[in-house]
Amino acid sequence: FFIEVKSNLTKKQIKTLAQGGAKVIQPGIESFSMSQLQEMDKGVRPLQNILCMKWAMYYGIEINWNILIGFPGETNDDFRQQINLIKLLFHLPPPECVGSLWLERFSPYFQRPEEYGIKITAPGEAYPFVYDSPNIDHLKIAYDFEFVTTTQIDPQLKQELFQTAEEWKERHQSEQLPYLIFTKAMDFVTVYDQRSLESIKIRLEGPQAWAFICCNEAPKSVGQIRDFFREKIGKDPEDNLAENAIAYLEEKGLLYG
């Protein structure tokens, strides 16, 4: 069956959905930009969106989602950060599309457009075709509206986001299916990475492997990673040992925080 859910589900909750027969979920991910998620009042962080995708795929649940743009206050930096991040997510299910924000009646954007830098310009494009009488005020009956914002985004960044999302979809329909998997031995972890068109094998040992394993199941703070190291070595870890391992994994695109 199909259900709509929030994207802040835990691994255990997603496993329960799978065991209960859920085949498709729509978690309303819509962005990997923290500022855009805050603007939407989603109550989630980009990392929670990533984890929802990860565990849904792990438990065999299809996930339907889209990337939304066109929010008031969005910046070029928001687009650049999101583009850079989604290039690291090619092993996860791609979005159905990149679409623009839909402005609806009764929403905060409709009720207080000036507060958000929005100017409502017309009713939705379909209304004049459906209600063609000249006596009907489409602005009074419409539920969705055309609008512009004071935000100016670099058109090349928009195009790059569209192209990156399209490449993501094409990769999942090709013979070169992207993947990111790992195997765990006693003293090391081997990561097999084909998110790009190049296959890469990365061997992680010591602190790098410990940090990788520590963060695999759920998000961890630096303090929690240090505690994990302490259990491994039986004493307080050296200064910056955890931080250096985290930095290495982030550089390789294996850790996000």
Give the predicted meaning of each segment.
Residues 1-64, 69-77, 88-100, 106-109:
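Conserved SAM/AdoMet-binding glycine-rich loop
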Residues 8, 73, 152-155, 198, ...:
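Generic amphipathic alpha-helical segments used as scaffolds and interaction surfaces in large
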Residues 32-39, 64-70, 194-198, 208-209, ...:
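Glycine- and acidic
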Residues 44-46, 84, 253-254:
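Short alpha-helix boundary/capping motifs
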Residues 48, 78-81, 224, 241:
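An acidic, carboxylate-rich microenvironment
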Residues 77-204:
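C-terminal accessory regions of radical SAM enzymes
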Residues 202-257:
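Long, charge-rich, low-complexity alpha-helical segments
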